Amino acid sequence: MKINPRELDILKILYSSDQALTVTQIVNTREDLTQSIVQTAIRKLLAAELIEVQGIAYSGNVLSRRFGPTEKSREVIFQRFLDSYRDYKCIIGFRTAVEGMLEIEEDKAKRVEDIEVLVKLLTEMKTNDQ
């Protein structure tokens, strides 16, 4: 499934929020977003079932739908990530990719937690492959 850069931006905004957002709230997150741009992207994302209406809220005197990402969107984004890695794995090796992913985590405690999860995952995978 193809997601254009603008739709991906909208998904990132929704994933970074701890609550479902209205179109107006999404527009207010970035200066380069307009109501019409966001509404167009929202329609496409809804049709593709990558987002869903997660509630209704008043925005002034108007009822507005609140949108949030679906599990399907997580799967599509993950597949896009894997496809990108496949395209570049001859240039960026496994070790470099993992180191890079760990380095972008600024919270040292979270990084340690991620390393522990990775060690556990690798141990399980090694055990299952034997």
PLM feature spans:
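Basic amphipathic alpha-helical segments that dock to polyanions
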Residues: 10, 40-48
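A short, conserved structural fragment
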Residues: 46-58
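Short helix-capping/hinge SLiMs at alpha-helix to coil transitions
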Residues: 14-19
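Short, cationic-aromatic polyanion-contact patches
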Residues: 3-6, 22, 56-78
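Short acidic, hydrophobic short linear motifs in intrinsically disordered regions
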Residues: 20-29
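Short alpha-helical segments that sit at the start of domains
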Residues: 1-13, 87, 91, 121-129
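Amphipathic alpha-helical dimerization/coiled-coil segments
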Residues: 75-126
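Short coil turns linking two alpha-helices in DNA-binding domains
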Residues: 33-34, 38
